[in-house]
């Protein structure tokens, strides 16, 4: 039995996916993907499976464990882990090209991070300045 492990990251969220032969079950932190809320996060997670096609989707089981970040960062990290797992599972360069054409961040990480707040104005954000008064 073949088992492949992959990871995906987005902002501070980290997802680890395990893919094995199965019947098309996808679980995120032990929950079936069908009950993941909000809907936009569910559709984001399912994108690589829809692009890969029914025959690939129905031949594998995918378990994803996600931690850190917000719901959308977690969804995008899970999407990346699933996409990488499917490419490795099939060994198909045309699938990799399809993912890259659709959205490059499915396979390649996004390096952007939040800017740290600076001293003296920590609640207002990293670049906020003190208000200047002329009289």
UniProtKB/Swiss-Prot annotation:
Ranges annotated as biased composition (Basic and acidic residues): 107-118
Give GO MF terms, alphabetically.
Answer: RNA binding; structural constituent of ribosome
Note down the stretches annotated as region Disordered.
107-135
What GO terms in the biological process aspect are recorded for it? maturation of SSU-rRNA from tricistronic rRNA transcript (SSU-rRNA, 5.8S rRNA, LSU-rRNA); translation
- Which keywords fit this entry according to its UniProt record? Ribonucleoprotein, Ribosomal protein
Query: Is-annotated flag, keyword Ribonucleoprotein?
Result: yes
Statement: the UniProt record of this protein carries the keyword Ribosomal protein:
yes
> Could you tell me where the Basic residues compositional bias lies?
119-135
Superkingdom is: Archaea
GO CC terms on record?
cytosolic small ribosomal subunit
> Which family would the database say this protein is a member of?
Belongs to the universal ribosomal protein uS9 family.
What PANTHER family does the annotation carry?
RIBOSOMAL PROTEIN S16, RIBOSOMAL PROTEIN S9
**What is the protein's given name?**
Small ribosomal subunit protein uS9
Q: Per UniProt, what is the name of the gene that codes for the protein in this document?
A: rps9
């Amino acid at each position: 039995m073949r088992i492949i492990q992959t990871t995906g990251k987005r902002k501070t969220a980290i997802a680890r996916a395990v893919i094995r032969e199965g019947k098309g079950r996808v679980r995120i932190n032990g929950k079936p993907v069908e009950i993941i809320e909000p809907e936009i996060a569910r559709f984001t997670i399912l994108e690589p499976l829809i692009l890969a096609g029914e025959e690939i989707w129905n031949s594998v089981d995918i378990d994803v464990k996600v931690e850190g970040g917000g719901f959308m960062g977690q969804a995008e990290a899970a999407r990346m882990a699933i996409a990488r797992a499917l490419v490795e599972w099939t060994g198909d360069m045309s699938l990799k090209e399809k993912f890259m054409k659709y959205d490059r961040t499915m396979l390649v990480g996004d390096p952007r991070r939040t800017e740290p707040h600076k001293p003296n104005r920590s609640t207002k954000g990293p670049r906020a300045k003190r208000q200047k008064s002329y009289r």
